[in-house]
Amino acid sequence: MSRFGLQKLYINGAYVDSTDGKTFNAVNPANGEVLAEIQSASAEDVNRAVASAASGQKVWAAMTAMARSRILRRAVDILRERNDELAALETLDTGKAMSETTAVDIVTGADVLEYYAGLIPSIEGQQIPLRDTSFVYTRREPLGVVAGIGAWNYPIQIALWKSAPALAAGNAMIFKPSEVTSLTALKLAEIYTEAGLPDGVFNVVTGSGAEVGQYLTDHPGIAKVSFTGGVKTGKKVMANASGSTLKEVTMELGGKSPLIIFDDADLDRAADIAMMANFYSSGQVCTNGTRVFVPAALQAQFEAKILERVKRIRLGDPTDPQTNFGPLVSFAHMESVLRFIESGKNSGARLLCGGERVTEGEFAKGAYVAPTVFTDCRDEMEIVREEIFGPVMSILSYQSEEEVVRRANDTTFGLAAGVVTNDLTRAHRVIHQLEAGICWINTWGESAAEMPVGGYKQSGVGRENGLMTLEHYTQIKSVQVELGEYASVF
């Protein structure tokens, strides 16, 4: 029997069996251990979840703002109390190092929930005077039942990023985690119930995106879909959502983000930033700065600093607190990353380090890929143009500011970008020209609860986090009041 046994669906405040009996396995990518057998939701199960959510949403929306706020803040407290327990489960399910999951995944997810819990009482409309005898007032009302579809790289954080603004605005959410990493979303559902969330307001349906995800995007009882994942899948989700019942959508999709290092930059700081922008979470971060642009005159120096830092990476068992680089999320994803690495080798890029699966000793049981750095890369190479979502850095040289801005923008993606320079005038000038939704100056990767995040171009639609996201989980009702006489033309 697997370590965590059979995992059921979470509907109407309790675990329930799927109606069709289909299951899939949760696998620890560090060693291939089957962690759990997880039930897959059927169309009938999704119908149950939607009916439950519709009923629960009416109860939730009727509660006072302060009452809703207190319940979500109670959930924040429980998340923080159980941080280490949840982090340990996230590490087993994703392969991410415990040093990361204990410090980031649950912590930042709880921060977002706390942020939106505090904003609930501030959701208000406007009063617009028309004349002495008439005025208009507006109400921000919830959409109703919304769906969240998560990615596998930050399972519980994404579940919180999606559910926090949705619930804060008075909606109910049906959440489908990635079938690769489903375990912590189910724990989050338990926590919401324990905190006092009415039954049905947060349901979890597990299963594949192709089946369960499509049930959600097609369902007429769902008003909005928020999706995190790849561009190809995102386009299908958006088409299904709009083609079925004209649902609203939020899409947080892929990226191939440029990190531009200028000639006046502190090269040590630049190298530190490049390392974090490529190898944190074993390179499985959508905002990673995988196209590293370096002045041609500084390329050799920069490469030496990167190699020096790669040697300091502590690849190992992700449950070891000393490890800071674990396996990839699955064996299938490892094969995808290795195919990109072979493409890099065959395209003429110069391999500085890595470029292979790690198979020494116990590592042979896991989905480990060595931190990989290519240099002398060209813009047309596949490793430079396509999102790899793994520990693969591409170094490109350039001659002028104008050139590097043009090349940085020469992509269908537009999720993130960054510059490293001591010249703040140049920093702002360049950032204002970069076609990306999230930009960093002399840093990389932080996405605070208050900061709207999302992409330009094919990297997404809409934003997550920040004030504006809360607005997109509501709809405006305008009401005109006439206090004076009414004159008919008939």
Swiss-Prot record:
Keyword Magnesium appears in the UniProt entry: no
SUPFAM superfamilies: ALDH-like
Catalyzed reaction equations: betaine aldehyde + NAD(+) + H2O = glycine betaine + NADH + 2 H(+)
Cofactor: K(+)
Keyword DNA damage: no
UniProt binding sites for K(+) 1: 93, 180
Subunit details: Dimer of dimers.
Protein known as: Betaine aldehyde dehydrogenase
Source organism: Serratia proteamaculans (strain 568)
This protein's encoding gene: betB
